[in-house]
Amino acid sequence: MKSGRFIGVMSGTSLDGVDVVLATIDEHRVAQLASLSWPIPVSLKQAVLDICQGQQLTLSQFGQLDTQLGRLFADAVNALLKEQNLQARDIVAIGCHGQTVWHEPTGVAPHTLQIGDNNQIVARTGITVVGDFRRRDIALGGQGAPLVPAFHHALLAHPTERRMVLNIGGIANLSLLIPGQPVGGYDTGPGNMLMDAWIWRQAGKPYDKDAEWARAGKVILPLLQNMLSDPYFSQPAPKSTGREYFNYGWLERHLRHFPGVDPRDVQATLAELTAVTISEQVLLSGGCERLMVCGGGGRNPLLMARLAALLPGTEVTTTDAVGISGDDMEALAFAWLAWRTLAGLPGNLPSVTGASQETVLGAIFPANP
């Protein structure tokens, strides 16, 4: 069974940077050793935003974007190796999620698309890459997401305490770690995505630092109720979503009914939308004693305060409190999934994704010996 140093690479729906994590992984433990966040050039970020919102590209433009992202991921890995004074031979493999540009797990031909050419990463780092993690699950009738609950269960499940892990990235997803029950998990809806999109358009800021804008505004209740009427929120699990659905166009359609509103009030309403949709799903799933938050949303003081207020009797904390960096959780999960793939172990949970069976995930892009 492969064990040793693995690198996880994650570029999430928030597009706030490429997260790269170095960890030692074997069948008994996952020990994080180092991490870094690598910036995404504004031009690349905008290109990804455009394609996620349905803007047409030529095949040439699409191919260039795939190559550019692969090179970006390789640069991020090489920066971490240099920082840690490591060579390619010191790493077993890289687990690279890729950049999701479209996720459509239902319909006549279900599919999901993550780009960032893994061949570029192998060529530029000299390290074996495991990528394309989601499509095998979809081929077996699953949603292809979320995949991280299996990792949450391996690291954070408790024999007696009802726990849930909440990742608030661009999309928010919940892992249900309830003793005596199969692991559950699904996307609750928008996490930071709409808040980030709004402040980017209104103020040119990548995100609302410390919720300053949202805290200066007031929740517009009719707008909140209008957004909460979206059918996704009442759809039963398994379910997953992404930027192709909850994007700036979605927000604009709801704002048409509310002309002339204060931008800060919209920011406050979007924060409340995230908090309310998450807390409703926690309660619908039977509640928990401890809700452990990871992802960028864990640094949003307004979101954390609203979750605590909406979930009385639940201890709302971050995964940092139990020794796992909330910022690095997803990248660490894909390093772990790469280890499972190389070990021939399944990486999905049918109780989460709805797939017909457990399966080994991903494709292996081997480095030259």
Curated annotation (Swiss-Prot):
Transmembrane segments: none annotated. Catalyzes the specific phosphorylation of 1,6-anhydro-N-acetylmuramic acid (anhMurNAc) with the simultaneous cleavage of the 1,6-anhydro ring, generating MurNAc-6-P. Is required for the utilization of anhMurNAc either imported from the medium or derived from its own cell wall murein, and thus plays a role in cell wall recycling. This is Anhydro-N-acetylmuramic acid kinase. The lineage of its organism: Bacteria, Pseudomonadati, Pseudomonadota, Gammaproteobacteria, Enterobacterales. The gene is anmK. GO terms for biological process: 1,6-anhydro-N-acetyl-beta-muramic acid catabolic process; amino sugar metabolic process; peptidoglycan turnover. NCBIfam families: PRK09585.1-1, PRK09585.1-3, PRK09585.3-2. One of its GO terms (molecular function) is kinase activity. The keyword Transport does not apply. The keyword Transferase applies. ATP binds at residues 12-19. Pathway: Amino-sugar metabolism; 1,6-anhydro-N-acetylmuramate degradation; Cell wall biogenesis; peptidoglycan recycling. It catalyses: 1,6-anhydro-N-acetyl-beta-muramate + ATP + H2O = N-acetyl-D-muramate 6-phosphate + ADP + H(+). It comes from Escherichia coli O1:K1 / APEC. Its EC number is 2.7.1.170. Gene3D superfamilies: 3.30.420.40. Keywords: ATP-binding, Carbohydrate metabolism, Kinase, Nucleotide-binding, Transferase. HAMAP family: AnhMurNAc_kinase. Belongs to the anhydro-N-acetylmuramic acid kinase family.
